[in-house]
């Protein structure tokens, strides 16, 4: 990559599988007359130095790395210091990724979530403050989830049944809060589970069938939405966007046997955007392409509105 020049949009990632997604964003940006630079771990040190020196500049940073890779946080800090627009800034990601916080916010907003018990971190409260009787409303088995340790079900216990299971899980990430959560059983018909993943990208909602057991996507068609009364799914994603304050995220929603839409996995702030055409468990290509198009369009709109460099810290 060139370490010199002025760019409208910088794309940063520490995950090699973001390559196809970034290629689509670059293509969409070019169609809108936006220049781009992609920053990978191998480029980070030189890029950061070039940005400090002023030999490399960008107006917007789409940062897929800083929340999980501390070495990228410095670049975001530098960008913030120069009042660049950051999509999405670290403080917004931290707020949205806290499952305990989102659970309470969702309930306050009238969204339906699984029955949940929230526990303080083991390090500060070794005694969970609950008894075996308190587990009864969760059913058996139930989930044990760290509130802030995210990505690929990291730290999640899928088949907990006892207080001993809870205590063992809490010791895995002793500085994190934990959620004990009932299993939501989705409606099933003709072998299809009514479990969905919704995507929010800069004011636009998309959704797909997503099997929580196989982790495979299937296109959700307008005919599906009409036939099964799935319109509320899209409104739920919009309401979550208003709560979490991210420009781009995904969420999981299940339609249960009682006809209720239940938000089962709150805000995925680091969406896996591998293409289905390249990976069996990837996201449908049409969704990924639309996200790329929405991102590029959002960047162009924000730059046009600001007249250049942004003084705004994050998405609203």
Regions of interest found by a model, annotated:
Residues 2-10:
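Extreme N-terminal starter segment of soluble prokaryotic enzymes
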Residues 255-316:
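C-terminal active-site "lid" helix and adjoining low-complexity regulatory extension at the edge
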Residues 142, 179, 206, 249, ...:
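Protein kinase-like catalytic core scaffold
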Residues 106-107, 134-154, 175-190:
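ATP-grasp fold ATP-binding core
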Residues 13-125:
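Conserved N-proximal alpha/beta basic substrate-recognition cap immediately N-terminal to
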Residues 157-241:
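Phosphate-binding site of ATP-dependent enzymes
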Residues 10, 60-62, 143, 179:
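Structural motif
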Residues 246-258:
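A short glycine-rich, hydrophobically flanked beta-strand micro-motif that places a catalytic Asp/Glu
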